[in-house]
Design a protein with these regions (language model features):
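Glycine-rich phosphate-binding P-loop
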Residues: 2
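P-loop NTPase motor domains
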Residues: 7-21, 27-202
Length: 202
């Protein structure tokens, strides 16, 4: 939505459900929009979930006019798979972009060295440098590291307010991917339940 048309309804649902539903995403200067695309309550990471994480990282890593090479896509896919494997085994690791970044910087760097992956095939230092603004205290460190541990799968009413972010070249693509991943996840996993996606004033 744009224009806060659903703010009142969303607040009412949030209040009536004791905060369990009526989830409102918007951007404010003192409370910027944030997500955690790596978090799931049940640690289920199906094909769509993994692909959405890879697409999200690719969007932040590469410009529109800079398509990734096949070797880079494979390296990223392996990094995501190995990271998911690690957080499934060690539930003390908090799934978010920060821990993924740390994993690539330390563990995955060793994997690449052991496999003799050449820098021209996957430049891990360049990868980390480009994504550093989304890590911890970086300019966009808030964006993919939400501490709310919110799994949107079973939330029945979610509003994404795009007024402030629709012209932002960094935030808008991320929010769009999150919206599509949320809806696809509901379509695939919530069998026998009617779903609706409403695009208002698009």
């Amino acid at each position: 939505d744009t224009g806060n048309s659903y703010k009142g309804l969303c607040d009412l649902i949030h209040q009536k459900t004791g905060g369990d539903d009526g989830i409102y995403f918007t951007y404010k200067e003192n409370d910027p929009i944030s997500f955690n695309p790596f978090f799931t309550e049940d640690y289920q990471y199906d094909i769509e979930k993994r692909d959405s994480i890879k697409t999200l990282i690719l969007t932040l890593w590469k410009r529109e006019d800079e398509p990734p090479r096949r070797s880079e896509e494979v390296a990223l896919s392996n990094a995501v798979s190995l990271y998911i494997e690690k957080i499934r085994k060690n539930r003390k690791i908090k799934p978010n972009f920060n821990s993924f970044y740390d994993f690539v910087r330390k563990d995955y760097r060793k994997v690449l060295a052991d496999k003799n992956v050449r820098e021209k095939d996957f430049d891990v230092d360049g990868f980390l440098n480009v994504l550093e603004p989304y890590y911890k205290n970086g300019e966009y460190g808030y964006l993919l590291n939400s501490d709310k541990e919110l799994d949107l799968l079973n939330k029945r009413f979610i509003v994404f307010e795009l007024d402030v972010v629709k012209d932002n070249p960094i935030l808008f693509p991320v929010v769009t991917i999150i919206i599509m991943e949320t809806f696809i996840n509901k379509m695939r996993r919530l069998q026998g339940i009617r779903k609706m996606i409403l695009i208002e004033e698009a």
